[in-house]
């Protein structure tokens, strides 16, 4: 499938920071999803794991997935930005590479679909301000 990428979404998984990609795949299967919620996840050591090729549609943000790529750091169960330095560093490299490949794509945190007012957010994912960070 040839997709036009309009958005790059940054997420946290909202779970235990020590989880591994296989744990996430089990969670997605339990939800009845045929595909993962993210294209890439970053574990606590800063290792990036490809969960789904970019050519395929992930289940990251309902209603926004067709033209989006989803990147997540594993963790965030406390609702805070508890990324390790390794996760933050890897995220910066991935975002830089994706922005080079898809220069027209808008970079957003999951929560940004509800605007800038925290009172309107249905979740705090990715638990930090993507616009300020990147």
Put a short name on every predicted segment.
Residues 1-56, 126:
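Short, conserved "active-site rim" segments that organize catalytic pockets and cofactor/ligand binding
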Residues 56-59, 63-66:
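A short, structured beta-strand/loop element
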């Amino acid at each position: 499938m040839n997709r036009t990428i309009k958005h790059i979404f940054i997420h946290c998984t909202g779970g235990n920071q020590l989880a591994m990609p296989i744990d996430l795949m089990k969670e997605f299967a339990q939800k009845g999803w045929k595909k993962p919620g993210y294209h890439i996840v970053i574990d606590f050591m800063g290792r990036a794991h490809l969960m789904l090729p970019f050519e395929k549609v992930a289940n990251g943000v309902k209603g926004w997935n067709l033209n989006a790529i989803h990147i997540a750091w594993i963790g965030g169960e406390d609702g805070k930005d508890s990324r390790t330095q390794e996760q933050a560093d890897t995220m910066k490299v991935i975002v830089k590479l994706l922005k080079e490949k898809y220069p027209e794509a808008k970079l957003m945190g999951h929560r940004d679909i509800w605007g800038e007012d925290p009172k309107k957010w249905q979740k705090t994912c990715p638990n930090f301000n993507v616009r300020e960070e990147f």
